[in-house]
């Protein structure tokens, strides 16, 4: 005999289902569940008097020798994912990877259990009924200035850091490069202790090929070209030749001063080859005043950095001071002041908001400690999405914000993974990928995760007083969990390296314990492959007024006085 309960009772017990709307933090964004993969009446719920018990939703006979038995299951969770959509399901994990999105349980007593999602005595369970699951974020613009950045990143929901540097040296303060084989080895060894996945850029500024090849052979997953080292056409061509030869990505911070050519000269040097452009609006650096036009090319993978996201009343003033520090400028030198002023343009920053909302800008990143904040990639993404809804209205006619939500979450999950040849392993919650999963309470979505899971093991979480009788008493703050302790750190995070480095077995050569995974497919991607962010309109910039037009239409917006996900979340 079937039991009928009210929708309110169902949601209170098992979480929202198809058609229910969930507000994301204190934004004006509402996510509506599109599909529920669970069987009504057979939902798995752990706890006293609940269903995950021996002989009920937990098999009484299945051992871990059975490859269909899970190590970890997150039940009844709402998933927000650029590839899967906005759905309700159980997430099954085994051997550190996602093996199922569907219905977990005991096939001896339940119908419609997904074949490889058996709950047994070997399975840990986490109730996700009132949580949102997202893929761990990927930040592709890291200045590795201090190792403490990794803690702030993972506490914000970012689980993969890609960039370069050697610590607080001036070269690293300004540029995201780990120069040379010796430093590459040292940085891999240092990053063994970090609880996040890591990939390093070599220095791409060299007009001959062998100095670039040796860095890739030493482990660099890509090359970074930076204007402070000279972003000349010869350098660009050399880096891209080596990239095509060795299947790695090239990231570029172009020539703000137009010393060796203008944007058109840079695009001519790129010559249709795929490239990842950093802070493509230009405040972070790049051809003044029209680097933003690079976003219209099909071979350009355009990214933003978070200090300009979104455009607020304080954005301009803050940038001038940051720029002076990061690029070793002097306010007493007129040429330095002119350099700074040329990079900070309200008109192009305003346009950047809209280009993100249109899907023209495809990736969000931080520019950590070099004008950007490593812990604010996720926050700034959703603040931009909210601002655009308030200023531009809904996208589409769905009666919800699902398309906008999927467009924006793609910017810091799947799209940076595609750009750097690692989408086979991370960037979404699709089956087969590493189980880097972030769980959020809806009221804290985008700001403060509940739990961060790395490779199937809880690594960071909000945790109360360890001496308390239960986990929740104050003070509650982020603490490293067992997945970020001892030898487990090497088992819950990976290094992304070049194929040449993997072939050379740098893991053994450098004495590393973390798994190394080779990037691949970096040279055959284009903007068309970037999820929900593949638009390539014609962009023009007025050289005197800096006005930006898309297909002939002026695009601009007003700065805002306040943003969601802001001060009310950080009172203490």
Swiss-Prot record:
Keyword field contains Metal-binding: yes
Cofactor list: Ni cation
GO biological process entries: urea catabolic process
Cofactor comment: Binds 2 nickel ions per subunit.
Protein name per UniProt: Urease subunit alpha
Catalysed transformations (reactions): urea + 2 H2O + H(+) = hydrogencarbonate + 2 NH4(+)
Positions annotated to bind substrate: 226
The organism's taxonomic lineage, starting at the top: Bacteria, Pseudomonadati, Pseudomonadota, Gammaproteobacteria, Pasteurellales
HAMAP family xrefs: Urease_alpha
Enzyme Commission number: 3.5.1.5
Binding-site residues, Ni(2+) 1: 141, 143, 224, 367
InterPro entries per the UniProt record, alphabetical: Amidohydro-rel, Metal-dep_hydrolase_composite, Metal_Hydrolase, Urease_alpha_N_dom, Urease_alpha_subunit, Urease_AS, Urease_asu, Urease_asu_c
Gene3D superfamilies the UniProt entry points to: Metal-dependent hydrolases, Urease, subunit C, domain 1
Domain Urease: 136-572
Sorted UniProt keywords: Cytoplasm, Hydrolase, Metal-binding, Nickel
A family per Pfam: Amidohydro_1
Gene this chain is encoded by: ureC
Recorded family membership: Belongs to the metallo-dependent hydrolases superfamily. Urease alpha subunit family.
GO cellular component, one term: cytoplasm
Localisation: Cytoplasm
């Amino acid at each position: 005999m079937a039991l009928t309960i009210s929708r309110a009772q169902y949601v209170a017990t098992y979480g929202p289902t198809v058609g229910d709307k969930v507000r994301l933090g204190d934004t004006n964004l509402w996510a509506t569940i599109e599909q529920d993969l669970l069987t009504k009446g057979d939902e798995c719920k752990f706890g006293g008097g609940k269903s995950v018990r021996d002989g009920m939703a937990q098999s009484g006979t299945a051992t871990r020798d059975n490859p269909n038995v899970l190590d970890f299951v997150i039940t009844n969770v709402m998933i927000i994912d650029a590839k899967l959509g906005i759905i309700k399901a159980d997430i099954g994990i085994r051997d550190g990877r996602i093996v199922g999105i569907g219905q977990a349980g005991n096939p001896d007593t339940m119908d419609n259990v997904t074949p490889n999602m058996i709950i047994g005595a070997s399975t840990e369970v986490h109730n996700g009924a009132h949580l949102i699951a997202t893929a761990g974020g990927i930040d592709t613009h890291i200045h590795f200035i201090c190792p403490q950045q990794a803690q702030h990143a993972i506490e914000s929901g970012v689980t993969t850091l890609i960039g370069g540097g050697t610590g607080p040296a001036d070269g690293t303060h300004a540029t995201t490069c780990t120069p040379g084989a010796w430093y590459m080895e040292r940085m891999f060894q240092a990053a063994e202790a970090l609880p996040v996945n890591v990939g390093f850029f070599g220095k791409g500024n060299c007009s001959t090929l062998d100095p670039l090849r040796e860095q890739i052979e030493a482990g660099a997953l890509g090359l970074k070209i930076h204007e402070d080292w000279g972003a000349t056409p010869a350098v660009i061509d050399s880096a891209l030749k080596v990239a095509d030869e060795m299947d790695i990505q090239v990231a570029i911070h172009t020539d703000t001063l137009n010393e060796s050519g203008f944007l058109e000269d840079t695009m001519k040097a790129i010559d249709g080859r795929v490239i990842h452009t950093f802070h493509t609006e230009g405040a972070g650096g790049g051809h003044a005043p029209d680097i933003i036009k690079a976003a219209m090319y099909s071979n350009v993978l355009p990214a933003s950095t978070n200090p300009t996201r979104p455009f607020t009343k304080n954005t301009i003033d803050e940038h001038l001071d940051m720029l002076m520090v990061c690029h070793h400028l002097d306010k007493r030198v007129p040429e330095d002041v002119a350099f700074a002023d040329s990079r900070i343009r309200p008109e192009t920053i305003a346009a950047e908001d809209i280009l993100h909302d249109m899907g023209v800008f495809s990736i969000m990143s931080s520019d950590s400690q070099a004008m950007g904040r490593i812990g604010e990639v996720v926050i700034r993404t959703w603040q931009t999405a909210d601002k655009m809804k308030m200023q531009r209205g809904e996208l589409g006619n769905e009666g919800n914000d699902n398309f906008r939500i999927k467009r924006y979450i793609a910017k810091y999950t799947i799209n940076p993974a595609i750009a750097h040849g690692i989408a086979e392993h991370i960037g979404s919650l699709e089956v087969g990928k590493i189980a880097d999963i972030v769980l959020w309470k809806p009221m804290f979505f985008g700001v403060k995760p509940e739990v961060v899971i790395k490779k199937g093991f809880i690594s960071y979480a909000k945790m109360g007083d360890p001496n308390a009788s239960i986990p929740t008493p104050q003070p509650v703050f982020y603490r490293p969990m067992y997945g970020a302790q001892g030898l487990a750190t090497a088992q819950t995070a990976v290094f992304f390296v070049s194929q040449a480095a993997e072939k050379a077995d740098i893991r053994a050569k450098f004495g590393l314990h973390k798994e190394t995974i080779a990037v691949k497919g970096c040279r055959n991607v284009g903007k068309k492959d970037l999820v929900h962010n593949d638009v390539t309109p014609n962009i023009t910039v007025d050289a005197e007024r800096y006005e930006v037009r898309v297909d002939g239409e002026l695009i601009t917006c007003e700065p805002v006085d306040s943003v969601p996900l802001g001060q009310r979340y950080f009172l203490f």
